[in-house]
């Protein structure tokens, strides 16, 4: 497929920053880590059945599934240092959510996060449930429903907003998770949430805009060279 050339280009452009916005290994209290695993599990199980059904009924979509996974891995591995001393990155989740839906992307996103934890030390195994919930579940759901709500009016705008807002809501969810786990001792949860949100806002808003634009370009390329596959998914 011709869009594999685009993926290979991204691979060679990935920066190798050592920090990650994924919640790092051991950072969450054990109880919190377990709760996020439990909340993520139903979405993951449904996603497995969804992928199995998709491959069985439309085996020609296997390559597109693989490309979506590779795109997510590459884009979410781009760690950009923040002026606040933290790091941000795109999520890459919007593309797959638009094409295959949120449940399929829950599985793909979880696999991406697992490989990043094992191979790149981004995130961790104990925090995999929390990172899955924020990026692969919330990000996918937001992207999917934004696209479905707007695509009949203007497809490119729908794609942009889906990827843009899916990215932002991933970080809102991560900030919520951290604020719940570590409320401010004096001012409580709300103050802590505002603090975590402000840490990532400076770099994440521009990154979300870039991710939205990149996703529009990629969708256009897939439409250009593999329109039939997108039609099979109702796009």
From Swiss-Prot:
Membrane topology, record value: Multi-pass membrane protein
Alphabetically ordered keywords of this record: Cell inner membrane, Cell membrane, Cobalamin biosynthesis, Cobalt, Cobalt transport, Ion transport, Membrane, Signal, Transmembrane, Transmembrane helix, Transport
GO BP terms in the entry: cobalamin biosynthetic process
Signal peptide per UniProt: 1-33
PANTHER family given in the database record: COBALT TRANSPORT PROTEIN CBIM, PTHR43627
Record-linked NCBIfam families: cbiM (TIGR00123), PRK08319.1 (NF006184)
Function summary: Part of the energy-coupling factor (ECF) transporter complex CbiMNOQ involved in cobalt import.
Membership in a protein family: Belongs to the CbiM family.
Protein name per its UniProtKB record: Cobalt transport protein CbiM
Organism expressing this protein natively: Thermosipho melanesiensis (strain DSM 12029 / CIP 104789 / BI429)
């Amino acid at each position: 497929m011709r869009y594999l050339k685009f993926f290979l280009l991204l691979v060679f452009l990935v920066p190798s920053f050592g920090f990650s916005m994924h919640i790092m290994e051991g950072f969450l209290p054990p109880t919190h880590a377990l709760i996020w695993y439990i909340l993520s599990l139903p979405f993951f199980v449904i996603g497995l059945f969804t992928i199995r059904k998709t491959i069985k009924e439309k085996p020609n979509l296997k390559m597109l599934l693989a490309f979506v996974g590779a795109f997510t891995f590459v884009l979410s591995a781009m760690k950009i240092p923040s002026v606040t001393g933290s790091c941000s990155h795109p999520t890459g989740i919007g593309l797959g959510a638009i094409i295959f839906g949120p449940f399929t992307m829950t599985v793909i996103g979880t696999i991406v996060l697992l490989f990043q934890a094992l191979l790149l030390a981004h995130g961790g195994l104990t925090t995999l449930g929390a990172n899955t919930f924020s990026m692969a579940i919330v990000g996918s759901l937001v992207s999917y429903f934004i696209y479905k709500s707007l695509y009949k009016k203007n497809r490119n705008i729908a794609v942009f907003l889906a990827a843009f807002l899916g990215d932002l809501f991933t970080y809102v969810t991560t900030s919520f998770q951290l604020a719940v786990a570590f409320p401010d001792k004096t001012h409580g949860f709300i103050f802590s949430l505002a603090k975590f949100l402000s840490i990532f806002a400076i770099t994440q808003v521009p990154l979300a805009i870039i991710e939205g634009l990149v996703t529009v370009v990629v969708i256009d390329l897939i439409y250009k060279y593999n329109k039939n596959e997108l039609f099979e998914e109702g796009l």
